[in-house]
């Protein structure tokens, strides 16, 4: 990271804590006050098309942005909270500039060498965090589409790994894949039931 003399504020958010499959992603964004971006909001309130168009604007007009993730294996080894914080730390570590302050959505933050403030519902309240939520969501959705091409039987293109009826039905039919989170209760219980059936 390069040091700088500007009081740049970096927003950080994650995407994908709840799904049964796929990595958890995080993004960080330093917005440029001279180039405001209209329409920033919590990514969950935006359509896919709006998220995609805002992603292009964020990448084009922000001072800096970066994306990180933690793998399914790391999620199962660390737990989803710690894996989310790891993804955030990785994203921040990729920034080409040093922020003066980091604003993190929620009430947990990674350990960093900069001042950090957690903000509950920050993705709805703070433009930098809104922008980060959008980048994290679109990056994770793109990864789930790539996983769908590898594992089409699970329908990741439809539910992005979340615990829908379609996904649970596919798990019961096809079993657990290498991209499923084995520490998550529905997956863990399915594996236990399969083991009981074999014994």
UniProtKB/Swiss-Prot annotation:
Q: What is its main location?
A: cytoplasm
Give GO MF terms, alphabetically.
Answer: manganese ion binding; RNA binding; RNA-DNA hybrid ribonuclease activity
Reactions this protein catalyses: Endonucleolytic cleavage to 5'-phosphomonoester
What does the entry give for GO biological process?
DNA replication, removal of RNA primer; mismatch repair
Tell me the ranges covered by the RNase H type-2 domain, including all copies.
7-196
Q: Top EC class per UniProt?
A: hydrolase
Q: Which cofactor does it need?
A: Mn(2+); Mg(2+)
Keyword field: Cytoplasm, Endonuclease, Hydrolase, Manganese, Metal-binding, Nuclease
Query: What's its job?
Result: Endonuclease that specifically degrades the RNA of RNA-DNA hybrids.
* Protein's recorded name: Ribonuclease HII
Identify the taxonomic lineage of the organism of origin. Answer: Bacteria, Pseudomonadati, Pseudomonadota, Betaproteobacteria, Nitrosomonadales
